[in-house]
Amino acid sequence: MDMQRKYGRTYHYPFSPGTTSDDRINKEYWQDIQLIKRLIHTEKLDGENNCLNQYGVFARSHATPTVSAWTRQIRQCWQQIKNDLGDIELFGENLYATHSIEYRALEQDFYLFAVRCKDMWLSWEEVKFYAALFDFACVPELPLNTQNQTEAEYRLAIIEQAKEMGCFAPHDVHTGLPCSMEGIVTRNAAEFPVVQFPHQVFKYVRKNHVKTDRHWRVNWQRARMAHEYRQEEGHVVLK
């Protein structure tokens, strides 16, 4: 296994408003989608992409395992499963640190979204299998049926779904007000080769979502779990 292989960059839909100057866009997405039998749409969560494999826990760079403070908990979890991973690489969204969205309904802080084995990205069913095997949750699957749609209908369905709040009560960290989900990630439900990644996975990101990486890292705060918010609300009621 090549320890240096990080997660591929996910190309944006051409109608994704949250692109930045260095983002990549799949202008031929519709042709790619016509070749995919079944799509899965999941909520894009606002966290750090972490990979767990037999060598350690990695953030975006796979040059060396991460030792950041906000990965301490997932690194402790890795210690328990590292000998069972073999060629399996688990990719998930680490929500231990709050970024641009404060989630108020989290039951845990790591959500699996992909599994790689050698030169293949495993199917969504296999992702769910390994999530259950290692006691992780998966990123939320969205109730979005886009089969047999025209391109215009498909585009509208993605845009409208992305306006929803999402599954974990997202709030803007600056205003404290409820906000929409960060975006949507679409993938082929079946397994596919690693080299085909740009043609099998697509994303839609809300406008003006991206904040400076330095901001959340320097002033990072631990994300609170749902039970902590419930306790806080209970204290307010008692007063």
Where do the model's predicted regions map?
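Core nucleotide-handling region used for phosphoryl-transfer chemistry
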Residues: 1-239
